[in-house]
Amino acid sequence: MKKYSIYMLGLLAAANFVNYMDRMVLSVMLPSIKADLDLSDGQLGWLTGMSFALFYGLLGLPIARLADTWIRKHVLSISLLAWSAMTMLSGSASNFLQMLVFRIGGGAGEAGCIPTSHSLIADLTPPEKRAGAFAVFTAGATLGLMFGLAFGGWLSTQVGWRWTFVLFGTPGLLLAALVVFTLKEPERGQMDGASVTAKVSTSESIRGLLSRRSYLHLLIGFSVTNFVSFGFMQWMPTYYMRTFDLSMTTIGLLMGFGVGALSLIHI
C-alpha cells in the first residue's frame, strides 16, 4: 500500500475509534445520569436503545446512497461533526427529552461513518489487501469500545458525566477538520479496473441487495448478533453496579478490557 493509503486507512480507523468511543461511554455513566436527571429504567432503555438504533438504522442506507453520489470526505466530515456535537451537547442535558434528542442526533450522525469509510477503503486498496484494510478499520471500533468503557468510567468519577461527554466529543471535531483538509477523493472503482458511469436509483439498489440470499442471511445474522451484544454491553455496567456495588472505574476497566480483548481476538 502507498503511504497515502496507509495514512487514509489510519484516519478512517481513528474516525471509527471515536465512533465507538462516543457510542459506548453512555453505558458506563447510566447510574450517574439516572440519579442526576431522575430517570426510570424505561427511559434509560430509550436512551441506550431505540432512540439511537432506530435512526442509526433508518439513515444508514440513505447516507450510504449519498456517499455513492457525492464527495465522500464531505459526507464523513459532516457525520463526524454531527455526532461529536451531539455527544458534547449531551453534557448539557437537563431532562430526558433533551438527552433523547441528543441521542437521536448522535445515531443519525454515526450512521454516516461506516458506509462512507467502506467505500473509501474499497477505492484506495487493491482487492488482495482489502480484507486486511477492513480488519484495521474494524480494530479501530474495538479499541474505541475499550477506551470508551475503560477510560470513560474513570473520567466520569473525576470530572462528572457532563464534562466526560464534552471531552469525548472533542476529538471528533479535530478529525472532521483532518478529513476535510487532508483526505483526497479517490476515483470510484479504480482498484477494480472499472469506472462508475451508470446511475442506479435507490430503489434499484435496495432491490438488488434484497435479491441476494447471502445478503439477507448476513443481514439477519448481524441484526440478531448486534441486538444481543449491544444490549449486553449497554446494561452490564448498571447490572454490576447494582448487584456487586462496584465503582464506575472498576466496571469500566472490567467491561472495556474484557469485552474489548475478546473482540480483538475475534478480529
Residue ranges and their predicted role:
Residues 26-27, 213-260:
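Extracytoplasmic gate region of multi-pass secondary transporters
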Residues 29-58:
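Extracellular/periplasmic helix-loop-helix junction of adjacent transmembrane segments
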Residues 38, 71, 92-98, 109, ...:
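Helix-breaking motifs and short loop linkers at transmembrane-helix boundaries and internal kinks
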Residues 58-97:
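Conserved MFS/SLC helix-loop-helix module at the cytosolic interface between two early adjacent transmembrane helices
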Residues 102-143:
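Cytoplasmic helix-loop-helix junction between adjacent transmembrane helices
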Residues 137-181, 185:
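Helix-loop-helix hairpin linking two adjacent transmembrane segments in secondary transporters
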Residues 187-219, 242-243:
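Juxtamembrane intracellular "pre-TM" segments in multi-pass secondary transporters
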Residues 265-267:
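Conserved small/polar residues in nucleotide/adenosyl-binding loops
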